[in-house]
Amino acid sequence: MIKVFLKTSIMLGITLGLSLYLSKAFSPVSSNLKTAYLSVPEDTLDLVVLGSSHTQYGINPAVIHNETGLYSYINASACQPIRVSYQMLKESLKTQNPNLIILDVFTMLPDQSVCYDESIYKLASDEMTGMEKINTLMMLDDKKKAFDYILSIRMYHQLWNELDIESLKISNEDLPYDSFGFINLQPKEYLFKYMEGPDKKYRYDLNQSDLDNLLKIKALCDENNIELLLVKTPFDMNQKNYDALMAVWDFAKENDIDYLDLNQYLEEMDFAFGVDSETWHNTNWGAYKNSEIISEYLLKNYKFNHVDNEDVNRNLSYLKKSTLFGLLLNQVDPYNFFKYASKFDGIIIIKYNGYYKTSIESAENALLNEMGFEYDFINNRNTNYYGVSVNGKLKGYDNKEFKTIINGNEIIVNKNEIIIDGKVLKDTDGELTVVVYDSDFYWHQNMNIDYGSKWFWKNDCDGWVCK
């Protein structure tokens, strides 16, 4: 009898394991394991961010690396409940041993009900493996659907005739992770709507299940000697959500959990709803500001055992290029244009036609210097300056015409034009023109300054067009 039981158990185990394995092969790509997290070299991440899509749009690992030198990954999912964040934490620790976990608390607030849908469990499970995937799918009310997702061979068995031997190779090695979980959202309207958080007015009772799972997350972090930081990125909060957020922070204090409320930094960040954020999701402009504040907080409050990794650096380089492109695209504020250009690697071309009426003062001079053009533009404002910098280092300049070759591309800059490989660049007729290229010369963005206009013309804009 015992032998029969053992044989039956072994056969059931083999059948279940084989079914789970083949389920991945039978699933179409859109339903298969989506996470690129497993492709990140093991034990290289310094911090992992968990939570809802607010962090996917609101925190940029490229900016954090620029400001701190640390590696981070946004292992979040749409409207991720706290109990799912616990499963995601367990999943994250399978391949990484970070010093810090950052947890978004949006789904502890009442507005989470707006985005709640059973599909959120399926979305989160796509970023998980093993028991964490199963545990998350079993949170579905429809258990039949949960089992179909777990054993998706049941749902997609009709695809058997489309499979080949390559379909059975279940691997994450080739999944690119160069977004690091960040979603690059462009501003859609050039609007500046400044907000202040309301004062706490009413007592709000948080969901007990959320509190229990938050304590489980803290316990798991403590068990692995990992620090835990709760965050809330900026979003348009009503009174009820604000009271709930204050209740979360009160609970955090009571349980010795660190937190950072970015909604308290709106004025310091000059954070504007419209250009920096939609109602809930922050744009790449807003994510930059959030990530700067987070970086400053990390350096002041935590210690990290960072080790450089060539593969991670290579993938971060791609994210930095796409980040810079997004920050400069449609950018009409020269101060931000120059600041962002100075923060990332790239090729910067300057065409400055000297004139005694230029409005260059110390702030503007500093920005030009930070882009690699070490020159006194204040005391030499009458003198022409045509130059090129590469990754923040001056390649060279001249006051009549400057020529150079970078990565096989010829650059000529003079009073009238900027020429790249024999072609005159369009839209470079400003009295001061700055052009930013990525290192591959794949894209470029221009900024023209007319000395007769203000350097900062935010209030003189109609949509994206400025006078």
State each model region's role.
Residues 47-51, 282:
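Short hydrophobic beta-strand that contains or immediately precedes a catalytic carboxylate
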Residues 3-24:
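Hydrophobic membrane-insertion alpha-helices, especially the h-region
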Residues 100-110, 171-268:
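Conserved, well-ordered alpha-helix/loop/beta-strand core segments that scaffold catalytic motifs
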Residues 118-224, 306-325:
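Secreted/periplasmic serine-hydrolase-like ester/acetyl group-modifying domain
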Residues 242-313:
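C-terminal regions of proteins
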Residues 25-44:
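Alpha-helical transmembrane signal-anchor/signal-peptide segments
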Residues 325-467:
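Short acidic-hydrophobic catalytic motif
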Residues 50, 54-139:
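Membrane-embedded segments
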